[in-house]
């Protein structure tokens, strides 16, 4: 039986001193590819942030792997985040460095010291995302699609148990969006659990099998056969 990698039971999340997502229940199994949907302002980003410890869970039980988010102390949050690959909406890349040195910075910041092991891991992850040829380019010289591939590569560096992506194709053209989704699909096939927040209906139809919808401070599950445009915007 597949274990539950993410398990939220009767969870209430605090956002700006207010309760939100009251009595939420959902789980994600190891190896799943799950889409998080809902209209703008429905709380998708906040729910994702609760998974990696940025938003506070004040009631219920919430586990990510062997981490109890309800009892997680501040000094353990960096340890949790090394187990999670996060694809931010605003990229957070260092524009004065090339792609390779951006990735070196991440590994050194998370405790890697051996130069050869760092090089080996970076080369491996660049190949997984098909951007080996970009390693010496400044991030400021990259296209939007290339930047997003670098961000995915960065998320893979510490071999995370789950990758969380918040609107990873939001600012990309349709062709680049498909390239990004194909990369995430390939990563998932190779064993990584993926959770993607998006409102792109065409991508949902093409790539999705399991859908969680944020609505009225709660989560509901939608089967693919019932997926409609109204599910996303209402």
Q: Residue ranges of each PLM-predicted region?
A:
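Helix-to-loop junction immediately C-terminal to a conserved catalytic motif
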Residues: 52
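Catalytic Walker B motif of ABC-type/P-loop ATPase nucleotide-binding domains
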Residues: 163-166
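Conserved ABC ATPase signature
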Residues: 138-142, 146
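Conserved catalytic motifs of ABC-family nucleotide-binding domains
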Residues: 159
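Conserved ABC transporter NBD signature motif
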Residues: 60-68
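Helix N-cap at the start of a conserved alpha-helix in ABC-type nucleotide-binding domains
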Residues: 174-176
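Conserved ABC ATPase "signature" region
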Residues: 67-68, 104, 116-134
């Amino acid at each position: 039986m597949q274990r539950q990698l993410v398990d939220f039971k009767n969870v209430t999340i605090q956002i700006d001193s207010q309760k939100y997502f009251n009595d939420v229940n959902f789980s994600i199994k190891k190896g799943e590819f799950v889409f998080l949907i809902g209209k703008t302002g429905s709380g998708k980003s906040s729910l994702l942030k609760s998974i990696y410890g940025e938003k506070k869970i004040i009631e219920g039980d919430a586990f990510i792997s062997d981490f109890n988010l309800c009892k997680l102390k501040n000094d353990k949050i960096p340890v949790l985040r090394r187990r999670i690959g996060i694809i931010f909406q605003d990229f957070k890349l260092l524009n004065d460095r090339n792609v390779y040195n951006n990735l070196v910075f991440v590994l050194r910041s998370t405790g890697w010291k051996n130069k050869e092991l760092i090089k080996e891991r970076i080369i491996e992850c660049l190949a997984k995302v098909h951007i080996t040829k970009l390693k010496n380019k400044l991030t400021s010289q990259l296209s939007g699609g290339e930047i997003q591939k670098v961000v995915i590569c960065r998320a893979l560096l510490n071999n995370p148990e789950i990758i969380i992506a918040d609107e990873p194709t939001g600012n990309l053209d349709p062709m680049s969006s498909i390239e990004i989704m194909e990369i995430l699909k390939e990563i998932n096939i190779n064993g990584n659990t993926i959770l993607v927040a998006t409102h792109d209906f065409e991508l949902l139809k093409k790539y999705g099998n399991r859908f969680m919808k944020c609505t009225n401070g709660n989560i509901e599950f939608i089967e693919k056969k019932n997926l409609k445009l109204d599910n996303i915007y209402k």
